[in-house]
Amino acid sequence: MALTVVDASILIALLDSDDGLHAAATAALLAHAVDELTIPASAYSEALVRPARAGRLDEARAVVGALLMEVVPLSPPIAEAAATLRARHQALRLPDALVIATGTSLEAGSILTGDTRWRGLAASVEVVG
């Protein structure tokens, strides 16, 4: 079974049927349904902001639970890898670097994102949409 890391943009789109990436994010997660799905804690927190504002945090947690998605904590090696990525790619935001660093540190087969600016940052990045 492969490991797939999920960016906040994918979970945000999955949780919001009006999101422009909703269908593509849903299809991508279905295509990786046999994989072990993980999301960095930083991306998980980012994806939960809208549901928290709407009083739908329990719903969002249930979706993550139904996907058997593991929330991966930030570790010193991941933080250091993210800092190195951020230093090399000045336009890359730190939250994005944390997701990519998580994927590379865990040797993920895929890192799913809706952010086209991630193309070419890591071989495992798959831009959805």
How does the language model describe each region?
Residues 45-48, 83:
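Amphipathic alpha-helical segments within well-ordered protein domains
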Residues 1-3, 46, 100-129:
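Acidic, PIN/NYN-like endoribonuclease modules and their adjacent C-terminal/linker elements
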Residues 61-64, 68-77, 81, 91, ...:
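Internal alpha/beta domain cores that form substrate/cofactor-binding pockets in large enzymes
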Residues 71-114:
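Active-site neighborhoods of divalent-metal-dependent phosphate/nucleic-acid chemistry enzymes
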Residues 8, 41, 96-97:
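Conserved glycosyltransferase catalytic-site signature
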Residues 1-38, 51-62, 116, 120, ...:
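Short, well-structured N-terminal submotif of metal-dependent ribonuclease cores
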